[in-house]
A protein has these predicted regions:
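Membrane-interface extramembranous regions
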Residues: 2-177
Length: 177
């Protein structure tokens, strides 16, 4: 007795795998990024010592060029502001798993990419360094993982993002008659 897969050519089978990858990879990526973001919230929103160390070092660095308070608890880039952005990104990534809300996943991926671009750059180019909490660089590694996964998700959801930006353009700059 032959099965359906016996009658498929290798090309048909690989096309099926590509289709499954395109369908399920964005959900897996969204899940990974969301888990990292949601796990970090317990540190940011409870003012954990690890968070105090990180944002304290960043605030000292900012003060060295006249931007004291930038990373303080009431600053523009405080742990609460960053944590809220991560919460919004995680929510959009997870809600975007539902087919009717795919565009939200694309927006969540952009927010995640932006937040993690900042995190990775601050780890690399400020006195914060890649191991501010003596955790072997685990925090930095997770930031890099989320940065890459969110970049991948932005790529996979590029059509949705193009539609969003086209709609914004039409709304903000209506055609003149």
């Amino acid at each position: 007795m032959t099965t359906m897969t016996d009658t498929l050519t290798p090309q048909d089978q690989s096309t099926g795998l590509v289709s499954k990858f395109k369908t399920y990879a964005p959900h897996a990526i969204a899940g990974v990024a969301s888990l990292v973001f949601l796990d970090s919230l317990r540190f940011k929103f409870t003012n954990a010592p690890e968070t105090q160390t990180i944002f304290g070092k960043l605030n000292e660095w900012a003060a060295s060029f006249g931007a004291e308070g930038l990373f303080a608890q009431t600053g523009l880039f405080s742990q609460y502001v960053i944590g809220t952005a991560e919460l919004v990104a995680a929510t959009l990534l997870l809600v975007g798993i539902l087919p009717a809300f795919r565009r939200l996943q694309a927006i969540g991926a952009l927010i995640a990419f932006a937040v993690m671009s900042g995190a990775v750059n601050f780890h690399l180019w400020t006195p914060l360094g890649i191991d501010p909490n003596n955790d072997g660089g685990g925090l930095f590694f997770m930031a890099v993982v989320v940065w890459f996964t969110s970049a991948g998700l932005v790529f996979l959801r590029r059509k949705e993002l193009a539609a969003i930006f086209a709609g914004l353009k039409t709304t903000l700059f209506p055609a003149r008659s």
